[in-house]
């Protein structure tokens, strides 16, 4: 069973992983290496610039006003912080070209899945489609809407 997982953050840069230079400097990801604004610390003293870590901690789909009404916001989750930074000057900016590409990829993936399900149905193979999920909060145990 193939699933596309929902997530809040586009990546774990600065929080779940960091880039380490040959000299021991720590950056949120490899795309920020050499930018003094995003130097987080080094391997000897650890993270000393906690403001950068905190900035990346709050970099998610909910931090971007432009993402609020997007149907794909919990799949792309605001995308790559470095792409946003290089396109807009802010890690919470919106890299519009990346958004368009991601939404188109999701649309294509959905259409491919629909086509595959139609082929299976034409062969008489039942393909269950789950429109809701049973949360057991409802007295009748039916799927929530």
How should each PLM-predicted stretch be described?
Residues 16, 45-48, 104:
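Short capping/connector residues at structural and topological boundaries
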Residues 1, 30-77:
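C-terminal accessory region of radical SAM enzymes
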Residues 7-9, 59, 88:
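Residues embedded in well-ordered secondary-structure elements
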Residues 21, 27, 41, 81, ...:
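Residues in well-ordered beta-strands of folded domains
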Residues 1-35, 75, 124-145:
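A C-terminal junction/extension of Radical SAM enzymes
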Residues 37, 62-145:
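Radical SAM enzyme core and accessory elements
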């Amino acid at each position: 069973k193939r699933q596309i997982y929902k997530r809040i953050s586009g990546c774990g840069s600065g929080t779940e992983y960091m880039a380490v230079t040959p000299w021991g400097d720590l950056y949120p990801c490899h795309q920020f290496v050499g930018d003094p604004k995003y130097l987080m610390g080094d391997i000897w003293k650890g993270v000393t610039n906690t403001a950068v870590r905190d900035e990346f901690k709050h970099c998610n789909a909910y931090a971007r006003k432009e993402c609020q009404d997007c149907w794909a916001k919990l799949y792309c989750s605001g995308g790559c912080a470095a792409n946003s930074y290089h396109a807009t000057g802010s890690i919470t900016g919106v890299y519009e070209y990346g958004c368009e590409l991601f939404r188109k990829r999701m649309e294509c993936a959905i259409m491919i899945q629909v086509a595959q399900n139609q082929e299976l149905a034409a062969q008489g193979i039942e393909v269950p489609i789950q429109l809701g999920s049973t949360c057991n909060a409802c007295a009748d145990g039916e799927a929530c809407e």
